[in-house]
UniProtKB/Swiss-Prot annotation:
Keywords: Disulfide bond, Glycoprotein, Protease inhibitor, Repeat, Secreted, Serine protease inhibitor
GO cellular component term, pick one: extracellular space
Positions annotated as glycosylated: N45
Principal subcellular localization: secreted
Paired cysteines (S-S): C8-C38, C16-C35, C24-C56
Site residues (Reactive bond 3), renumbered to this chain: M18, E19
Domain Kazal-like positions: 6-56
Note on domains (UniProt): Avian ovomucoid consists of three homologous, tandem Kazal family inhibitory domains.
Keyword set includes Secreted: yes
Location within or outside the cell: Secreted
A GO molecular function held by the record: serine-type endopeptidase inhibitor activity
Name of this chain's protein: Ovomucoid
Length: 56
């Protein structure tokens, strides 16, 4: 099984769009899109990872 990952190098960003493309984080929380997820990754100091694409 290939590891899924998202490039968060351009984050954090001050604002995210309302686009809905859900991602499931390793904290078992569904993030609305990559921007919301990546901002959370940055805030977690890299401890948050992507579990899978789609809702948890």
């Amino acid at each position: 099984l290939a590891a899924v990952s998202v490039d968060c190098s351009e984050y954090p960003k001050p604002t995210c769009t309302m686009e809905y493309r859900p991602l499931c984080g390793s904290d078992n929380k569904t993030y609305g899109n990559k921007c919301n997820f990546c901002n959370a990754v940055v805030e977690s100091n890299g401890t948050l990872t992507l579990s899978h694409f789609g809702k948890c």
